[in-house]
């Protein structure tokens, strides 16, 4: 449950406000001087009226002069209805802000061509952060105030009212003083929060103060009591001008465009010297939408886009490294958890630490208040559930596939020339296993030929009901001729399905062929290894990539072109950029022995897992010269040069056996067995023996093409994939957005825990509290109603944006009527009602959002940085649009649009003076003794928040005095 912990001075301030409002609402007399000056007609304006006027939507509650008890009842009804409408506005504003978050999160892919010709692709946000904060974000947080002003003017025959403008000024005062006071106070003692984009804050603060100064000018100086068309239009056009100025400050344009600062190291240690000079030429080209948008960096907005791209790349890399670090820590901390649980924890932790927009905090605050739960925890849990459910769905789909698929178990088979036959397995998966399936097979020549290397084979395989695999055999022909490795193919074709089979296996009926088909692989490749050669030994490929998480990597040493005899093949690991000795891998060496007819041997090397997001290190595995352990007697004799033999004293077939020993690196085997009748080292070989010797030499084991394997250790594919998926899931637009109406209705009727305990790193959802249930049932009507709003998935959020702002406008019209009727029922003027009650009601969600942002965010921009910009936007849009429409309407009718300058001009002037004090204090707090706009030592916090609350109380107090004519206004 989200609790707004207010400092004592703030809570006491709210009580004083209520007391002041009630006090001035029941003043029955005015001072003699004031009454003499104003006369009887002004007395009614000073004291307020108990006679209500017809609203834009709501009619007058008759009779107009009820009893005291009826007044209390009516006031209660109006007040409760107004509060309930505020809840509705908060919930639809939640949808509205979600659409804004999705809209401003849109990205565009660009191609960057570097001077060396290398091209890279990256994405940049379409919306600049500052521009989005001053336009859509400000509109989202201030939509009720802006629309109230427009609706009030348009709904009352284009005449000026007190409710809309006073709400804008009152809301600005509440934001500037109370929200900032709360943000200063809630930061833990000793911690500080600074504004990151200080230039933007200066610009928006200046425009905020100028906006209210401009209001005073057009009300009391330029044309007192009359708003002309040019004044209204200029007020509105100040809005885009303000946005452009803020964007310029954010992008460091203008002066920065022409002056390039360079930095060099001074002679003194630690000294950095700055000097100005020409910007170096750059030929980095950026291609967007197929067009080169700049050929030189200095010709494109001071390289703003290049800087943004570079910053984005750095941010992405930093995010990946941070995600990898978090996953590694969580795996060490929770070794018992499954990967889905670890992903959920990491997702929640990263989302909690990520810098968030004003829109997100507004949405989070609203959902916590209304029992919709912690959006981050819900998102993390939903993602974990989706991952598990998708896995189950895929498994179920595989098991319940309505189509029978026929395919080979594997696509490649190997056999020796002397194996006799090779067995191939055909599989049946999916479909109705109660039927009989037929499939034809047929061999086809490759480099191996039928009749000389293998037996041509064709036929039909029958899968009877319940059978899921069958085996076919193809005969292999052996010869004594040395040959290269050869291969041939076996194809599957013509799948048929039948329900009945005769006793002799003949198909009785053939139907429903659409429920069976060939799967993959439907062709098998059989490789025949020659067995008349000792073998050629090689790795499969010269380079292999392995994941650092593989643990024990296995490398195959292949024996091709023969497999006769026992052969020893030595190997060893060699360091490259990867280090042995257990740092990146463990040093390994050995001498595996290939047995007769054995064609594959596996070498195992242990790889050390560092769990790095990016890794690219290499080492090598090298095989040495193969050594023949045993050969046929005749070939052994022919392989060795005659001479230097040692008589063993043994005989074979009546002939003596000799042995000759060579060094380890000699190409001839170390030990051979020879047979000779009459040994003569000078005896020449016959031509037949020479031919046999040549053939035997060809059959000697040799090394093949790939004797040195380069092993590239890369980051874990699974680990990197998990990190990348989490990076995508940590897009806040995905967190706050919705994909379907079904999702919205489920969310609307679901109660979730509103606990805002972000220290709980588990990120797991908790059970809802009693407060969560109460708030849910109070707001379930609004939740279900606004679930009909289009999801943010449609039109990239614009459909939700349009419908939401229409709903906010409708509710705002009700709020304006209820507030006006509430005020006239108890005798409060519209200006006082707007400044106190309406401004407070529209600012409550922003108050909670700022409080959460102040405690969670690293900087103060999200909590108070947008307050000044929002205040300026309120004037330029809320008053600028409304007064422009009214001024144009009256000018078209030959009339003047009259606005009483008294109360509004006084409030504006008072607010402007206090705003100067507020901004000055905030800037002073950046001094080293405090360290930032928010937080700091406890004494400084209390003094600052007390001062700001006092400024707000004084603003309410003096505005009320002026409204009831106790002090003279303008």
Curated annotation (Swiss-Prot):
Main location: membrane
Pfam families: Calx-beta, Na_Ca_ex, Na_Ca_ex_C
GO cellular component: axon terminus; basolateral plasma membrane; membrane; plasma membrane; postsynaptic density; sarcolemma; synapse; T-tubule
Matches recorded under InterPro entries: CaCA, CalX-like_sf, Calx_beta, DnaJ_domain, Na_Ca_Ex, Na_Ca_Ex_C-exten, NaCa_exhngr1, NaCa_Exmemb
Name of the protein: Sodium/calcium exchanger 1
Repeat positions for Alpha-: 138-178, 839-875
Source organism (scientific name): Mus musculus
Signal peptide extent: 1-32
Catalysed reactions, as listed in the record: Ca(2+)(in) + 3 Na(+)(out) = Ca(2+)(out) + 3 Na(+)(in)
Tissue: Detected in heart, kidney and brain (at protein level).
All residue ranges annotated as the Calx-beta domain in the record: 393-493, 524-624
Keyword Secreted annotated: no
Binding site for Ca(2+) 6: 584, 610-612
Topology class, membrane: Multi-pass membrane protein
SMART domains according to UniProt: Calx_beta
């Amino acid at each position: 449950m989200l609790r707004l912990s207010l400092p004592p001075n703030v809570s006491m301030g709210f009580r004083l406000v209520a007391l002041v409002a009630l006090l001035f609402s029941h003043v029955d007399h005015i001072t003699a001087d004031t009454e003499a000056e104003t006369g009887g007609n002004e007395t009614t304006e000073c004291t307020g009226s108990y006679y209500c006027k017809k609203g834009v939507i709501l009619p007058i509650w008759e009779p107009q002069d009820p009893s005291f008890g009826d007044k209390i009842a009516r006031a209660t009804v109006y007040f409760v209805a107004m509060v309930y409408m505020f809840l509705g506005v908060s919930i639809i504003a939640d949808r509205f802000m979600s659409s804004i978050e999705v809209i401003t999160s849109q990205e565009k892919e660009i191609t960057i061509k570097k001077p060396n010709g290398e091209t890279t692709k990256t994405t940049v946000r379409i919306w600049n952060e500052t521009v989005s904060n001053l336009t859509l974000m400000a509109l989202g947080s201030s939509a009720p105030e802006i629309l109230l002003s427009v609706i009030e003017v348009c709904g009352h025959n284009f005449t000026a009212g007190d409710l809309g403008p006073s709400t804008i000024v009152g809301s600005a005062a509440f934001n500037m003083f109370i929200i900032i006071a709360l943000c200063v106070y809630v930061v833990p003692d000793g911690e500080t929060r600074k504004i990151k984009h200080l230039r933007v804050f200066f610009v928006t603060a200046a425009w905020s103060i100028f906006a209210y100064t401009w209001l005073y000018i057009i009300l009391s100086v330029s044309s007192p009591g009359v708003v002309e068309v040019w004044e209204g239009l200029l007020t509105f056009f100040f809005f885009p001008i303000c946005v452009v100025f803020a964007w310029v400050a954010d992008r460091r344009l203008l002066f920065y465009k022409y002056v390039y600062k360079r930095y060099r190291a001074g002679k003194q240690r630690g000294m950095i010297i700055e000097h100005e000079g020409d910007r170096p030429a750059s030929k980095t080209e950026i291609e967007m939408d197929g067009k080169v948008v700049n050929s030189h960096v200095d010709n494109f907005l001071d390289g703003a886009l290049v800087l943004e791209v570079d910053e984005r790349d750095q941010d992405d890399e930093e995010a990946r490294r941070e995600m990898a670090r978090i996953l590694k820590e969580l795996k060490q901390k929770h070794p018992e958890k499954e990967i889905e649980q670890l992903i959920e924890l990491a997702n929640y932790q990263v989302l909690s630490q990520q810098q968030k927009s004003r829109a997100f905090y507004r949405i989070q605050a609203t959902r916590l208040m209304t029992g919709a739960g912690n959006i981050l925890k819900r998102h993390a849990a939903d993602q974990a559930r989706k991952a598990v459910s998708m896995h189950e769905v895929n498994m179920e789909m595989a098991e319940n596939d309505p189509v029978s698929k026929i395919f080979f178990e594997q696509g490649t088979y190997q056999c020796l020339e002397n194996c006799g036959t090779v067995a191939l397995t055909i599989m049946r998966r999916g479909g109705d296993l109660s039927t009989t399936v037929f499939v034809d097979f047929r061999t086809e020549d490759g480099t191996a030929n039928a009749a000389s290397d293998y037996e041509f084979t064709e036929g039909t395989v029958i899968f009877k009901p319940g059978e899921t695999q069958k085996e076919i055999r193809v005969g292999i022909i052996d010869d004594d001729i040395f040959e290269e490795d050869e291969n041939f193919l076996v194809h599957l074709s013509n799948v048929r399905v039948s329900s009945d089979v005769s006793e002799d296996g003949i198909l009785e009926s053939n139907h429903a062929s659409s429920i069976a088909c060939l799967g993959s692989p439907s062709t098998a490749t059989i490789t025949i290894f020659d067995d008349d050669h000792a073998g050629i030994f090689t790795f499969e490929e010269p380079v292999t990539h392995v994941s650092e998480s593989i643990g024990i990597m296995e490398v195959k040493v292949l024996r091709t072109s023969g497999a006769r005899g026992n052969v020893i093949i030595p190997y060893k690991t060699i360091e490259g950029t990867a280090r042995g000795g257990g740092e990146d891998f463990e040093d390994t060496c050995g001498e595996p022995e290939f047995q007769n007819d054995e064609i594959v041997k596996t070498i195992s090397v242990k790889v050390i897992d560092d769990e790095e997001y990016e890794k690219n290190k290499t080492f090598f595995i090298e095989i040495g010269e193969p050594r023949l352990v045993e050969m046929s007697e005749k070939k052994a004799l022919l392989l060795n040069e005659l001479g230097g033999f040692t008589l063993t004293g043994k005989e074979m077939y009546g002939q003596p056996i000799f042995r000759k020993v060579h060094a380890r690196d000699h190409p001839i085997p170390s030990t051979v067995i020879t047979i000779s009748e009459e040994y003569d080292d000078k005896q020449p070989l016959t031509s037949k023996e020479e031919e046999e010797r040549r053939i035997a030499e060809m059959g000697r084991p040799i090394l093949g093409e790939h004797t040195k394997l380069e092993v590239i250790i890369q980051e874990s594919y699974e680990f990197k994939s998990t990190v990348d998926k989490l990076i995508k899931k940590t897009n806040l637009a995905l967190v706050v957005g919705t994909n379907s109406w079904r999702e919205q209705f489920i969310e609307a009727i679901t109660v979730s825990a509103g606990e805002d305990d972000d220290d709980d790193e588990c990120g797991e959802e908790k059970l809802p509290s009693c407060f969560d249930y109460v708030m849910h049932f109070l707001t379930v009507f609004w939740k279900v109603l606004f679930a009909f709003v289009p999801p943010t998935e449609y039109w990239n959020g614009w459909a939700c944006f349009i419908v939401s702002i229409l709903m906010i406008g409708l509710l705002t019209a009700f709020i304006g009527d209820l507030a006006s009727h509430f005020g006239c029922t108890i005798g409060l003027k519209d200006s006082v009602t707007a400044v106190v009650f309406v401004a407070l009601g529209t600012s409550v969600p922003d108050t909670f959002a700022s409080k959460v942002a102040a405690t969670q965010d690293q900087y103060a921009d999200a909590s108070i940085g947008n307050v000044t910009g929002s205040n300026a936007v309120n004037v330029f849009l809320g008053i600028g649009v409304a007064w422009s429409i009214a001024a144009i309407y009256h000018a078209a009718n030959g009339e003047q649009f009259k606005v009483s300058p008294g109360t509004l001009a006084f409030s504006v002037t008072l607010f402007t003076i206090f705003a100067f004090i507020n901004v000055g204090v905030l800037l002073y707090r950046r001094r080293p003794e405090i360290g930032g706009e928010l937080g700091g030592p406890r004494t400084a916090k209390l003094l600052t928040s007390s001062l700001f609350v006092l400024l707000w109380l004084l603003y309410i107090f003096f505005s009320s005095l002026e409204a009831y004519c106790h002090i003279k206004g303008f």
